[in-house]
């Protein structure tokens, strides 16, 4: 999932800069230790981003894998012209590479962090990991996070830098846009990666059961796939829903937009979130939202565009959905969409990144 967020930032930055991306990943199936799939000459004409993809042969040894990871990045970087700036997404290993490039070649680097591991209740531990992360963050020219709460959480862990900047995730406003529709039964949409520990999808199903027991009409579409997909489906069957819940699996492109934009509102029941990009995509489609009040979500959801509820409280989640089923038509789709265009579009985020680069 992080790869998608990185890709969108790279595409936004490429509106104003020449951007090259280095992508390194293990692969069990390659024959050589390292394999280049795309080279610098292979340029994506649509998104104006040059990409070097290098795969390294996966070993049973963690130490060998770590060595091959760093070696693969070194090989990829050698194929690039000397960069003016290195932009690291997601710590800590890649940050070590950028720090080394700064020490050896004097190349400044900035960090963008998306990861919720710094938020309360998550796992950011280990003396060596924390010390290395502190050093990488300290020596960066800037640190950007997608929400203010993530920046605060990082600093609470002692990750200090004098130049923290909020740079939100990108929403493809040309793809996610309203579709005129008239549902005979109100349609609720949930989109997630089906990882129940963070997304609490079973908690959402519990809340939907409460609505069903009150004889409230609704249909709910679950979009996505993940490690707990089958478990969640089985959980829904166990509770004997009366056919008003539908699982689509993964949807992409226009198929995703068609399902999302023909909804009446979105619901997210997460236990923790860094930002909740699917909520932004819902706003771009003109949908209000019901969401748990966790992580960076209160920075984007308020009474003008949705309803916030405490996490892990099916009763209050059900009450909020019941309220939204009665009031979703009061929200103006264009107003919801315009709030996203102003701050989260490719152009807006790209300009913000360009300003950061120019000021280094």
Kindly label every feature range from the protein language model.
Residues 109-126, 142:
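A short, histidine- and acid-enriched strand-loop-helix "catalytic/donor-clamping" loop
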Residues 180-199, 205-208, 221:
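Conserved donor-binding/catalytic core segment of Leloir-type glycosyltransferases
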Residues 303, 307-314, 323-329:
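Conserved acidic donor-binding segment of nucleotide-sugar-dependent glycosyltransferases
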């Amino acid at each position: 999932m992080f790869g998608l967020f990185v890709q969108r930032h790279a595409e936004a930055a490429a509106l104003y800069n020449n951007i090259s991306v280095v992508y390194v990943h293990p692969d069990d199936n390659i024959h050589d230790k390292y394999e280049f799939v795309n080279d610098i000459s292979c340029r994506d004409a649509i998104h104006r981003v040059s990409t070097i993809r290098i795969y390294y042969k996966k070993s049973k040894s963690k130490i060998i894998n770590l060595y091959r990871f760093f070696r693969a990045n070194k090989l990829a970087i050698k194929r690039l012209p000397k960069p003016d700036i290195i932009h690291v997404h997601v710590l800590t290993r890649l940050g070590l590479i950028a720090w080394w490039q700064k020490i050896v070649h004097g190349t400044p680097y900035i960090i963008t962090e998306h990861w919720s591991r710094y938020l309360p209740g998550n796992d950011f531990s280990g003396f060596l990991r924390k010390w290395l992360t502190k050093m990488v963050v300290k020596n960066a020219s800037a640190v950007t996070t997608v929400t203010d709460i993530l920046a605060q959480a990082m600093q609470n862990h002692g990750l200090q830098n004098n130049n923290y900047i909020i740079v939100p995730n990108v929403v493809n406003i040309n793809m996610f846009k309203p579709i005129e529709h008239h549902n005979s039964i109100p349609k609720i949409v949930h989109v997630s990666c089906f990882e129940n520990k963070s997304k609490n999808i079973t908690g959402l199903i519990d809340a939907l059961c409460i609505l069903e027991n009150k004889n409230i009409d609704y249909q709910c579409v679950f979009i996505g796939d993940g490690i707990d997909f089958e478990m969640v489906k089985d959980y829904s069957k166990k509770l004997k829903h009366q056919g008003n819940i539908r699982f689509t699996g993964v949807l992409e492109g226009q198929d995703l937009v068609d399902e999302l934009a023909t909804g009446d509102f979105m619901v997210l029941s997460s236990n923790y979130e860094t930002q909740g990009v699917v909520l932004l995509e819902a706003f771009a489609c003109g949908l209000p939202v019901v969401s748990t009040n966790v992580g960076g979500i209160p920075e984007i959801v308020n009474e003008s565009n949705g309803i916030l509820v405490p996490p892990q409280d099916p009763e209050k989640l059900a009450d909020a959905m019941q309220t939204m089923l009665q009031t979703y038509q009061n929200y103006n789709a264009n107003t919801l969409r315009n709030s996203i265009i102003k701050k989260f579009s490719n152009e807006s985020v790209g300009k913000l990144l360009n300003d950061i680069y120019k000021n280094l």
